[in-house]
Amino acid sequence: MANSTSFLGCSRFYATFEENLKLMGQLVYLIPSFILISKMIYVIQVKHRGDYHEQRRFWLLYTMDLALSLLNLFFDIFYYRLTLFVPQICESFSFFLRANPLLIDITYPLWFYFHVGKMVAQMSISFERMTFNLLKPNDYRRIWKHGLTACVIMIIFVPFSIIWNILISDKYIQFYFGGFQPNYSRRVNWFGTTAWQLTYMQISMAVTLLSNIVTGAILWKSQNQSRKSRLLCRIWFAISTEYLLSACAFCYLHMKTFAFDYSNLIFMLVIFVWDGFNILSPVIMISMNKSLRKQVFAMSGGSEDLEISVA
């Protein structure tokens, strides 16, 4: 089928077993990622909080990014993927949601909120890394004395500039594959959430790219940075590279939707791109950071030869 959407009801064209296999294939990586991110947040902010105090601005912003990923994965594992790939519950649960629309009224805007919040978090962390390397320590501390609060406020409130039209608009159920997903009917026609989300993504890409170019140039010329400082910057450069590649894929796929060249394949690719946004950053961080990896997996020597504390 070229287009899997329907407004009439649950589709009978999709085999239950095959749809359930699609779900299981995704849960294989979604659930371990959910557990990994949960443990990373616990280690950074609770169990070994003191180890991350020296670079607390970076780690606070990164924890917010992890928390947004965690919430995205929670929604995907326990709600969105189930409604999409479990045809057995399609009729009963879609009927329940239509009879109790408050759940969609809350969860659908939150889905966009979490994704936009990650874009703002990415920009904030990239800017923090640039200023850390560009400015003198006293200037850096003076700027981030209030800059951290400003970034936290932006991460919390900027997403509302995207989701406001969803909040005031009527939501409905649109049937995909053997299940369904929520959608909305614009109350303000000129404000397309997807188009503005694409704009925010491009702004996030520009800030991330510029910040990392400046950071890379400084590290290339400077020999004064400590080994630990350079390590954290290399890790964030790798995370930013992954982010930019995923963002390019996101922009390309959404441009295809604007051209009405939409298909089941594009729909699934968009899902996998969002999975990449949520999962690859913590995987890169845990892979490149030996000390954090030891602490998360409760290995011996987690506090020895610490590589995450930066002067």
UniProtKB/Swiss-Prot annotation:
Pfam families in alphabetical order? Srg
For this protein, the record's InterPro entries field holds:
7TM_GPCR_serpentine_rcpt_Srg (IPR000609), Nematode_SR-like (IPR051119)
- Listed GO cellular component terms? membrane
Q: Which GO terms describe its molecular function?
A: transmembrane signaling receptor activity
Q: Which compartment or compartments is the protein found in?
A: Membrane
List keywords of the entry alphabetically: Membrane, Transmembrane, Transmembrane helix
Q: Where would you find the membrane-spanning parts of this chain?
A: 24-44, 58-78, 101-121, 148-168, 200-220, 235-255, 266-286
The membrane topology term of the UniProt record is: Multi-pass membrane protein
Where the protein is mainly located, per its record?
Answer: membrane
Superkingdom in the source lineage: Eukaryota
Give GO terms for biological process: sensory perception of chemical stimulus
Q: Which family does it belong to?
A: Belongs to the nematode receptor-like protein srg family.
Report the PANTHER family cross-referenced here: SERPENTINE RECEPTOR CLASS GAMMA-6-RELATED, SERPENTINE RECEPTOR CLASS GAMMA-RELATED
Indicate what this protein is called per its UniProt record: Serpentine receptor class gamma-6
- Where is the organism placed in the taxonomic lineage, from the top? Eukaryota, Metazoa, Ecdysozoa, Nematoda, Chromadorea
